[in-house]
Amino acid sequence: MLYATSFEANALSVINVATGEIIQSITTGAHPDSLILSRDGTKAWVMNRTSNSVSAIDLVAYQHVADIPLEKYDGTGMSGKPGAWVMALSPDEKTLLVPGAGRGNIVRINTITHQKEDFPAGDARGVVSAMGFRPKNGEIIFADSQGISRIRAEDQQASIMTQWCSRSVYSVEGISPDGQYLALVSYGLQGYVILLNINAGQIIGVYPASYVNHLRFSADGRKIFVMAKNGLIQLDRESSLDPQAIIRHPQYGDVACIPEP
């Protein structure tokens, strides 16, 4: 099955891949955007732009289960942000993280009770552009307007790992499933996908791709799939151009800096 949000119909469409037929249309909130699935494919959570909410969906019964409001709706919604909104599901699938609508913060949702939970560590510094969990230690990694931060599982304290040095020509597109790598995309015709080692704050991969508007990692993080100017491209993490070439480039240069202690 293929699952797709219908922005105008306010629904999640269930599509038979073999026939291309829409076999179910499940009601969501207003103007659904991002979608995240449970690993067994029985549940889905949909971010709704205009109603500023998350819809919980049962994919076995094809039913809308609950709507979780993110903030009081003021009529403006989240439609001013380009691209799909990011979400992150914890390894045990009991916690869903979503960016707050219109504020620099992260909202934590209990997927069992469908309730928001207090999350003081979720204060970001501007729009959250990517986030994810590190399965090995439960840390949360997120990128915002100032750089990359982590929230430790043991004490729920946030700390800055890497600050942006020169990010005006890049957009943050995603974090690898293991939480070790961050993918950025450069603007312009001669574009690149840039792979950053989060811990080291260093560029480790550069891949040519122009006009990228969507990016996803494979489950093992070794492949990067991008929707670019010429269609869908599959990139191999190990098959990179020389990273030093992009670091020395007068237009692009260094991306990130390790903060001073």
What residue ranges belong to the model's regions?
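Predominantly soluble domains enriched in secretory-pathway, periplasmic, or organellar proteins
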Residues: M1-P261
